[in-house]
Amino acid sequence: MHSNPLRKNLKPHLWFQLYWVVYLIWFFWLDLTVKNPTYIIHAPLDDLIPFCEWFVFPYCSWFFLLAGVTALLWWYDTASYDKLCLMMFSGMTFCLILYMVLPNGLDIRPTAEAIGRDNIAMRIMQMLWNADASVNVCPSIHCQSSGCMALAFSRSKLAQDRPGLKVLAWGWALLICASTVFTKQHSIVDVVCGLALVAVWVPVLYRKPKKGM
């Protein structure tokens, strides 16, 4: 009896995606229970970054980056897919634990009335603000996961000898990170902390072997 190659690919790696069930329940529980954060995240640089509602589109493109990179690595480079899941899911878990121990939030979001503009981007921003409270922000999971996806993809077989794809992956991820501060979804502090959680994995998973070994 011949084994089905698709079924073989499904086991066990796709089961890692069950983590999203745990993550979403945990995240939204925190979103509902943390009403008055103990720590307000703010940096002087935040006041110099203007609000631009049009960055909501690269902000929302995170979902496409997530789906695309996850599917491509799962199908074509299982080893890189495993590294992505390890980096991204462990980082998300760390963030959620930190949100519980050190409840934090933002005070930099403007109101629609203060902005005084009415366009499709502003309407999307208002829906986003209504759905996503300005709590549980540091480190930024949006930035942490974007960095993990760019790192895993750029070091995968798919991007090997394809510098254009590496630039595209990192450019997209950094645009998403920039969008978080231009839409006032995050402080620059959240972004730096989120990317720091990506950087710690580089020497662990992508350290070059020493010569002669």
What residue spans do the PLM features occupy?
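Membrane-interface loops
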Residues: 31-44, 74-164
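Alpha-helical transmembrane segments of integral membrane proteins
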Residues: 11-19, 82-90, 164-169, 189
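Aromatic-anchored segments of alpha-helical transmembrane domains
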Residues: 24-29, 92-101, 171-181
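N-terminal transmembrane-helix/juxtamembrane module of multi-pass inner/ER membrane proteins
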Residues: 1-66, 116-118, 125
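Non-cytosolic membrane-interface motifs at loop->transmembrane helix junctions
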Residues: 43-46, 114-115, 189-195
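Hydrophobic alpha-helical transmembrane segments
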Residues: 56-72, 89, 93, 145
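Hydrophobic faces of alpha-helical transmembrane segments in multi-pass integral membrane proteins
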Residues: 18, 22, 26, 86, ...
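Membrane-embedded catalytic cores of phosphoryl/pyrophosphoryl-handling enzymes
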Residues: 125-213
